[in-house]
Amino acid sequence: MAGRKGGRAKRRKVCFFTANGITRIDYKDVDLLKRFVSERGKILPRRVTGTSAKYQRKLTVAIKRARQMALLPYVGE
């Protein structure tokens, strides 16, 4: 098989929270959490969003808490 020619170079994604100086992810901030949930209601992985491992863990906990408090739906619409 021949190697791939051309194409675009992949750009490194920057962590949203590190870039904006956000240190605490609040489960009550539904608008922020919705950015990291798919239209089906699943938590988007790091390779899609570009968040760092530290903030991905905090984000997951915040989304799960928001779901438990009925601020976010478990399933998409």
UniProtKB/Swiss-Prot annotation:
Described function: Binds as a heterodimer with protein bS6 to the central domain of the 16S rRNA, where it helps stabilize the platform of the 30S subunit.
Domain of life: Bacteria
UniProt keyword annotation of Cell inner membrane present: no
GO BP term (any one): translation
Keyword Ribonucleoprotein tagged: yes
Annotated GO CC locations: cytosolic small ribosomal subunit
Keyword entries, A-Z: Ribonucleoprotein, Ribosomal protein, RNA-binding, rRNA-binding
Subunit structure: Part of the 30S ribosomal subunit. Forms a tight heterodimer with protein bS6.
Protein family (similarity comment): Belongs to the bacterial ribosomal protein bS18 family.
Protein name from the UniProt record: Small ribosomal subunit protein bS18
